[in-house]
Structures are given as C-alpha cells and as structure tokens.
Amino acid sequence: TIVLACNAYLEKLEKKIAGKIMPINNFMLATEPLDEDEARYINKDNVCAHDNKFHVHYFRMSQDNRLLFGGGENYTTKFPSNLKSYVRNTMLDVFPKLEKKKIDFAWGGTIAVTVNRMPHIGKLDSGVYFSHGFSGHGVAMASLAGTIMAEAIDGLSKRFDVFNEVKIHAYPGGTLLRW
C-alpha cells in the first residue's frame, strides 16, 4: 500500500491531485511578553482565535504572555527578507495598540490550501491513498487524516468514505501558475 502524505510538498509527484492544492507560505510571530492587563485586553478569555477573512489571522497567548500571531502569507518560493516586519504589519492591522511592542521571534512554513479550504483525502484509481490541503489546520487534520487512511487500509473505511466523497475542485490553471 502506498500513501502520499506530502501536503504542500507534493509538487508534481502525482499530477492528478497536485492541481487541487496551492502551496503558500504562512508566517507567525511572537511579541515580547505582555503585562497581564495587555494580555487580557488582547485575549480576555485566553483562547485560541481566528477570523474568517480570506487571508486568515489567528492568535493566542503563550504561557509567558507573548502574543503568538499568525497572518500574512506569500505565494513565492522565498520568505520575506524581514519576516518580523512583514508579519508585524499584519498584526498591527488587527491590534494597533501593540505598535510599541517588540517582536522577539518570527517564523514560517509552507502549507497547502484547497479552493474550498477542506482537506483533500482520498484514493486514486491506482490504489494510492493520499491526504493534503489542510489549509492551515495541518497540526490537527494531518494526524486525523493519517488515522483515517490507516483505518481504510485496514478495511474500516466509514470515515475515509466521508472525506473521499467531498468534491475538491482544481485551481484554475492547475499547477501552471506555480513557483
């Protein structure tokens, strides 16, 4: 049994499904520690949160009261030269009161996004299982997809069949407009 679990790194390994994801770079930052009042102003219930914009912003507080903020992406093979500044500008659109706060860390990675933001989990005619297109939810969804594919390979396909039936459309142009 073969399983393709490449997410954004599928590239041209399997052309039948490569056009159904768009690899994008997504970035995060961590501010300097905020005092308790600042932290509660930003996130009074200390929960993970995100908005519903096309380019999603997401955030939570760390144990030491740093704002962990994700937002800002690009569609090239390179990360911005000043990642802290790049993400900071996006953060300030959401939290302008943090203008004077220092950014201690910034990082990023490449994710795979589907047109409808649903994960693409299925089986090719050749019998190859695949999962990708977690659209920024890969930490949780990739583990679930692995479990679902393992169940299907073991003959328990009920949950797999649900995802396999979800129609994932290809991006216009497929892989032609990629890096």
Q: Across the structure, where does each feature detected by a protein language model lie?
A:
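C-terminal lid/capping helical subdomain adjacent to the catalytic/cofactor pocket in oxidative enzymes
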Residues: 125-130, 134-179
